[in-house]
Amino acid sequence: IIDTRTLVTGSGKSLHEAGLNPARPADFVLFSQEQIARFEGRFELFDENTLTTWVKGRTFHGEERLVPVSMVFVNHRRLSKFGRYPIPPINAPAYAGISAGQTYTSACINALQEIMERHATMCWWHNPANNPRLSIPKRGPVASLVQEFKAKGNQICIVGIENRFNM
């Protein structure tokens, strides 16, 4: 359920000029011009002038920050039933990213792990040729898990994914 009272419409530039604090497009893993061309209109460039719908959130340090609604909610397309909310196709569907915990601390830890996982997945998805394959261990829990999946007919490879978190 999306609380429409937390939504704001505008470009990052116009929202910043209005005194709000939108996330910068450069802070996200985005499609390159080449990828946008390759997908033949499925996605659009996301920059400071892109008109979109934003949702209010908070940074880890408690600062209010606006982020594109399409990067937060899986069901963002349903917003058209409730009003005019521009949502350009600036990103692939966000099927993950929800985090919770029994305490504030555990929720924050889970959220940080989710951010790292999503960032690594997007780096891998958008740059598969740049990710070197790593050797699969011969013994131990990872080897057992790999064997379990191979026994079910799956092909397994492990890749190294460079990311801004150095993990």
Located regions from the model:
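Helix-coil modules at protein/domain termini and other flexible surface or pore-lining loops
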Residues: 1-167
